Amino acid sequence: MPNLLSRNPFHGHHNDHHHDRENSSNNPPQLIRSSKSFLNFIGRKQSNDSLRSEKSTDSMKSTTTTTNYTTTNLNNNTHSHSNATSISTNNYNNNYETNHHHNISHGLHDYTSPASPKQTHSMAELKRFFRPSVNKKLSMSQLRSKKHSTHSPPPSKSTSTVNLNNHYRAQHPHGFTDHYAHTQSAIPPSTDSILSLSNNINIYHDDCILAQKYGKLGKLLGSGAGGSVKVLVRPTDGATFAVKEFRPRKPNESVKEYAKKCTAEFCIGSTLHHPNVIETVDVFSDSKQNKYYEVMEYCPIDFFAVVMTGKMSRGEINCCLKQLTEGVKYLHSMGLAHRDLKLDNCVMTSQGILKLIDFGSAVVFRYPFEDGVTMAHGIVGSDPYLAPEVITSTKSYDPQCVDIWSIGIIYCCMVLKRFPWKAPRDSDDNFRLYCMPDDIEHDYVESARHHEELLKERKEKRQRFLNHSDCSAINQQQPAHESNLKTVQNQVPNTPASIQGKSDNKPDIVEEETEENKEDDSNNDKESTPDNDKESTIDIKISKNENKSTVVSANPKKVDADADADCDANGDSNGRVDCKANSDCNDKTDCNANNDCSNESDCNAKVDTNVNTAANANPDMVPQNNPQQQQQQQQQQQQQQQQQQQQHHHHQHQNQDKAHSIASDNKSSQQHRGPHHKKIIHGPYRLLRLLPHASRPIMSRILQVDPKKRATLDDIFNDEWFAAIAACTMDSKNKVIRAPGHHHTLVREENAHLETYKV
C-alpha cells in the first residue's frame, strides 16, 4: 500500500515547529480548537495520529505519555528515561519563554484562527492524498520490525512529541534519514483495489461474484494474444453475454501495471455507444487481481467466416463496408483510433449489423479541449492489415490514417476472398510491385463514369430484347411453312443481307468478354433473384455481341486498361498473368473476321444449300415452274456445289498456312520472352483492376502508400459511390432498419458444422 498521507498532512515547512511548541504550552489559548482527523473527514474513524489530538491538550501529560511509551521499548529502564523527561520538559519551557515574543511579532495567527488546518495548504495536501507517494512502500510487518529493531517509536512531527523528536535526533542522528520510510500511513492497509482511491469504476475483486451475477462460463468462442472469449448465459433471464478473460499477469509485471492494461480496455469500451460498436457491460477480477474478466454484448456471427464463404453479394459487401466505416467514424469523433481493424475484430448480429470489438490496441489521438493530433508509436495490429507507415515510421505516425488503410484492406478481402499481400514490406513481392508506378496511367474516375454509361445502355437493350422476344412469341403462332417461305424468298436474292442476318443470329465464334462485362455478369449472377434469372441470361447474350463496338469506342487509356484486365482476369496472386489465352483469342477473332469478310461466295453456297434442304424437306412449298427453269436451276446448283468444294479445299490450305504462321509467331515470341512468358503488372492497378469500377476512384485514394495523400473519412463519405450505398443500421431503440436490395449471409455452428443462411 503506498504511503498516501504522512502524519501531519497540513504542516510541511520547517518553521511550523515554532507553532508546535507554542500550542503545547502549559497555558494554551482558549481559541484553539482541536481538529478532527483527516480520515474522519473522508468518512473513517478518528485516528490517533491526527493533526492536533483532543487528548493532547496538556503538554506535560502528552510528553509523559510519549516518554512512557519510549521507556517501554527501551527494556523498561525507568530511571534513565525519567531524566530524559526532565530534560525535555525544561527544554520545552525554555523554548516557549524565549520564542513567545518572537512569534507574536511576526503576526502569526495560529491562536486566533478558528480553523485548525492552514488554508494555503489544504488543497495541495488533498491532492497529495490522492497521488501515490514516490517513496518506498513498506508493509505493516516491515514497519513493526523496524520499530522493534531500533527500540524507539517512529519519528513524528505531531504537536505533542516535537521535543522528544529533537532529543531522539540528538542521540540517533542516523535515524532521521529514514523518516519517511518509517512513517506509518494514515490510511491502514486494505485489500481493496489499488485503483479504488483514484478511480470511480466499481471493480468486483472476486470472481465468485461473476458466477453469481452472470452464471458460469461456457464454450470458447475465440482466443488471441490479449486473452480468450467465452460465452455466458445468465440463468435468471437467459440473456447471453460474451466474457473476455484477459491474459494472466506475468511474473515480472506489477499488480498496478496489469490492472492498468486490463481496465484500460474496459474504460474505453464502456464509454462507447454506437450501433456498429460492441457494448461493454461489466468488469471483474479475482481476489489476487491476477485475472480480469470483461462482460460484453454477444454477437453470434463470425464475420471472417461469412467472408470466406464467398457467398456475399455486391450489395452485401457494400453494406458491410459502410457499417464498418460508420463505426470507425464514431471512434474518431471520440478521439480514439482502433489500430487493429481486421476481419477477426468484426462480428455480426443475427440481423446483419456489423460491430467492432477488441479495443486493447486503441489509442487516444485527440484529447478534450485540444485541436492537435497526438501521434502514435509502436507496431500494433496484424501484418496483412498494417499500414506501411507503421513499419517505416514506427516512432511517430497518425493513427487515423492507419484505420483508413485497414478499411481498404478489409474491402479487398471481402471482394477477393484473399489478402492482397502478407505484410506491407519490401520483402513481399506483391506489395513491392504495388508500390511501383503504373505501366499505363489510369483515370479511374473517367473509367467509372464510362462504365456507368455502359450499364445504362445494356439495361435499355435488355428491355428492348425482352419486348422483341414477346413479339416473336406472338409471331410463332403463324404457320411454320409461311415463315420458312419468307425466309427463303428473303435470303436468295440478297446474299450479303443473309450473311449479316446469319452472323447476327448465330455467330460462329463469339469474342471473349472484357473485364467490365465479366464483372457485370458476375455481379448480376450474385445479385440476381429467381425473377431476374431470365434477364441475366439475356444480358449475357447481348454483351457477347457488343463487345467489339464497346472496346473500340472507349478511350485509349481505357482500351489499354481493358486489355490488361482481360489479360489479368485469370492471374495468380503474384500478378503474373498468362497472356497466351489473350493472344489466341485475338488471333482467332482476326481469322474469323477475315473469313467472314472474304468468303462471301462460301457463305452464299451455304445459304443455297440451306434453301435446297428446305425445299427438299417441304416440296409443297416450292413454286411450280416450267421444266426448262427446273433444269436451269439444277445446273446452277451443280455448278455452285463444285465451286463450293474447290473453295473449301482452297480455304483449308489457307487456314493451315495461317495456323503455321501463328504457331511460328508464338514460338518466336516465347523464345524472345524467355522461359517465363507471363506478363507482370506494376503499380496499384494490379490490385485495383480486380475491384469494381465504381469503387476504384475512392479505393485508389484509401490505399495510397503515402499517408499524406491518403483519403480522409470526409473524402470517403463525400464520394459519390460510397454515399449512394444503402446500409443496414439500428435506431435509438435498437430496432434494426434494413436497407433494400440485398440480403446478409449468416454462418452458424450447428451440429458440429457450419450452416449458412440468408437474412
UniProtKB/Swiss-Prot annotation:
Biased segments, Acidic residues type: 510-519
Residues that, per the record, bind ATP: 221-229, 244
Modified residue annotations for Phosphothreonine = 495
| Alphabetized Gene3D superfamilies for the sequence | Transferase(Phosphotransferase) domain 1
Q: Which reaction does it catalyse?
A: L-seryl-[protein] + ATP = O-phospho-L-seryl-[protein] + ADP + H(+); L-threonyl-[protein] + ATP = O-phospho-L-threonyl-[protein] + ADP + H(+)
| Bias kind Polar residues: ranges | 113-122, 493-502, 663-672
Record-level GO BP terms:
intracellular monoatomic ion homeostasis
- Write out the biased-composition intervals (Low complexity): 59-97, 614-646
Keyword Acetylation in annotation: no
Keyword list, A-Z? ATP-binding, Cytoplasm, Kinase, Nucleotide-binding, Phosphoprotein, Serine/threonine-protein kinase, Transferase
Which residue range or ranges hold the Protein kinase domain? 215-722
Q: List, as start-end ranges, the regions of compositional bias called Basic and acidic residues.
A: 520-547
SUPFAM superfamilies assigned: Protein kinase-like (PK-like)
Miscellaneous comment in the UniProt entry for this protein:
Present with 300 molecules/cell in log phase SD medium.
Q: What is this protein called?
A: Serine/threonine-protein kinase HRK1
Q: Which organism is it from?
A: Saccharomyces cerevisiae (strain ATCC 204508 / S288c)
